[in-house]
Amino acid sequence: MIMYGGGGAGKDGGSTNHLSDGGVILKKGPWTAAEDEILAAYVRENGEGNWNAVQKNTGLARCGKSCRLRWANHLRPNLKKGSFTGDEERLIIQLHAQLGNKWARMAAQLPGRTDNEIKNYWNTRLKRLLRQGLPLYPPDIIPNHQLHPHPHHQQQQQHNHHHHHHQQQQQHQQMYFQPQSSQRNTPSSSPLPSPTPANAKSSSSFTFHTTTANLLHPLSPHTPNTPSQLSSTPPPPPLSSPLCSPRNNQYPTLPLFALPRSQINNNNNGNFTFPRPPPLLQPPSSLFAKRYNNANTPLNCINRVSTAPFSPVSRDSYTSFLTLPYPSPTAQTATYHNTNNPYSSSPSFSLNPSSSSYPTSTSSPSFLHSHYTPSSTSFHTNPVYSMKQEQLPSNQIPQIDGFNNVNNFTDNERQNHNLNSSGAHRRSSSCSLLEDVFEEAEALASGGRGRPPKRRQLTASLPNHNNNTNNNDNFFSVSFGHYDSSDNLCSLQGKTKTTYNTSNLNYSSLQVKCKMFMIKTQI
């Protein structure tokens, strides 16, 4: 087939779509025997070289390149046919170990073999050895091109090594010279960090571990770690389980709830207490009361004092703040004085719930336990309240964290208390509820007539270490009472001329009291 126009060379140098200088159309495709004879006769007479003159001198419709390739690969007299011998194969392996893929230079070392034959042999051998998993070179032959790589490849490898080393140095500088302020202010999905108590154990604290590996640590989990990085840089901190806290506090841990230190020290098991905020409507604080079932001991009321939510009160201090829903005339500073009266023999405290008196220690329980000191001559269940300004009744809802009853029973009293606990609790609850109504009526009655309101004070006494057999030695006894402007104690029983029987509460007398003061209020 003869085609006009330029084209590439075909097999054995046969040109395609090509015209000679004289305008002769050149052939392409396989050579014929007549063409081989014309080419062989011309080379025997004129020798090898000047292949473009073959077409001019012989009229052969082949280009010079096609004539050269046909003579070198098929027509020359010293050409070897067939497969390679063992010596030739070993020589090819040695030459390839020294020269690499230099097929023409290898063919010059093998007389009678062409570069195309050597290339085909090596590629076939390479595929077979890779498929079988055998080494490419025998043990006695070491590739020279691997020991002495090409200068261009060596420079490229050195450039890649220096670039990788420079990236590592930048990562180290970002990690070790990053300001601490940026690490502390880095946002995260965990709560605000707060230090964990030093004596907290792994089973008694509920903490989350703050990890921002992608922000604080330059080596993120998605970045491949080289051996140099693994040896020179510390690994990123792992995520700790929410049920345990890390032993080494190198990174800030975040407690989910600010528990008191006493609870953390005492609770060594895995039980966790989650304090909940109290509901909006709660019964009066003096409703939670218990009494001793003893003939010589009056009703013992344990008054619950509420504080601001999640603001613990120091257990070792004898002064505290009270935030309860009853107004006081003015906010005064805390004073300590002793009132000599027949109703109380313990020192009294006048407390001020100022903002500066809020404690900040987190190592003490978050509620104050006020224990009533029984007396044979008087009975006081009036708690002491103090506020800076008056509030509406709808806003006077106490926020109570919790309460705790501190009772020092003897063996006989404990048995009597267990027998009469159900009935006495119901009666004392009703008594306390009516007492609160009675106090509110008294406050309204005194305020309407222009009488000065009574200043409520807290009377506290130091604990008696001789008679105290309980473990709660740190608590102190508190008795509540009313003090007017002249510091005279006004007892509730003195106003109504009513005495309480310690063995049986007179419920009807409390109803009469309530009705009397309700009538006074209406007047």
From Swiss-Prot:
**InterPro entries of this UniProt entry?**
Homeodomain-like_sf, Myb_dom, SANT/Myb
The subcellular location is: Nucleus
Q: What are the residue boundaries of the HTH myb-type domain, all occurrences included?
A: 23-75, 76-130
| Residue spans of biased composition, Polar residues class | 175-185, 396-410
- This protein's superkingdom? Eukaryota
What causes induction of this gene?
A: Accumulates in pollen tube 4 hours after pollen germination.
Keywords for the protein's UniProt record, in alphabetical order: Activator, DNA-binding, Nucleus, Repeat, Transcription, Transcription regulation
User: Which residue ranges are recorded for the region named Disordered?
Assistant: 140-254, 332-373, 396-426, 444-470
**Which effects follow disruption of this gene?**
Disrupted pollen tube growth. The triple mutant myb97 myb101 myb120 is impaired in pollen tube growth arrest and subsequent sperm cell release in the female gametophyte thus leading to a drastically reduced fertility. Altered pollen tube-specific gene expression.
Q: In which tissues is it expressed?
A: Expressed in pollen grains and pollen tube. Mostly expressed in mature pollen grains, and, to a lower extent, in inflorescences and siliques.
Q: Which residues bind DNA?
A: 51-75, 103-126
Q: Which GO terms describe its cellular component?
A: nucleus; pollen tube
Q: Name one GO molecular function term.
A: DNA binding
Instruction: Return the Basic residues bias intervals.
Output: 147-167
Give residue spans, biased composition: Low complexity.
Answer: 202-212, 223-232, 341-368
Would the keyword Oxidoreductase turn up in this protein's UniProt record? no
Question: Which GO terms are recorded in the biological process aspect for this UniProt protein?
Answer: pollen sperm cell differentiation; pollen tube growth; positive regulation of DNA-templated transcription; regulation of gene expression; regulation of pollen tube growth
What this protein is reported to do is described as:
Transcription activator. Binds to 5'-CAACTGTC-3' and/or 5'-TAACAAA-3' motif in target gene promoter to promote their expression. Together with MYB97 and MYB101, functions as a male factor that controls pollen tube-synergid interaction in fertilization. Required for pollen tube growth arrest and sperm cell release in the female gametophyte, probably via the regulation of pollen tube-specific gene expression.
What name does the UniProt record give this protein?
Transcription factor MYB120
**Which organism was this protein described from?**
Arabidopsis thaliana (Mouse-ear cress)
Give me the gene this protein comes from: MYB120
